[in-house]
Amino acid sequence: MLGLPWKGGLSWALLLLLLGSQILLIYAWHFHEQRDCDEHNVMARYLPATVEFAVHTFNQQSKDYYAYRLGHILNSWKEQVESKTVFSMELLLGRTRCGKFEDDIDNCHFQESTELNNTFTCFFTISTRPWMTQFSLLNKTCLEGFH
């Protein structure tokens, strides 16, 4: 029995179509994984300096004699806006035993008290070009205590 001339070609075309879609799916998955990895690297590289700027700004604007330092990063994310990176973060800040104008507040112990006024939960939005050490505070909202 004679087969149709395109019958073998059709099965090859179908095979190529199926394999082609698998290759595209693998490429899309790899691209997504790479993008997630790049996003993680940017956060790991630039978030610490941005958090430091946020805490420094909080201390500069605070009327309290005592310095506050980072207790925990509660949440953070990054957005790209034109040529700037914008970090949004929710931080738990604790009052230390050191004055805010002392040299090494990073090593100051937290004040030990059950009073809520020893901590602040703050939401910061900071526009930055961290590779140029440029930071700009866009928003700061703080509430006393842990929320």
Curated annotation (Swiss-Prot):
The species this protein was found in: Homo sapiens (Human)
Misc. comment: Lacks critical consensus sites important for cysteine protease inhibition.
Signal peptide: 1-28
Location(s) in or outside the cell: Secreted
Alphabetic keyword roster: Disulfide bond, Glycoprotein, Protease inhibitor, Secreted, Signal, Thiol protease inhibitor
Protein name listed in UniProt: Cystatin-9-like
Keyword set includes Nucleotide-binding: no
Encoding gene (name): CST9L
GO molecular function list: cysteine-type endopeptidase inhibitor activity
Expression sites by tissue: Specifically expressed in testis.
Gene Ontology terms: cellular component: extracellular space
CDD domains in UniProt: CY
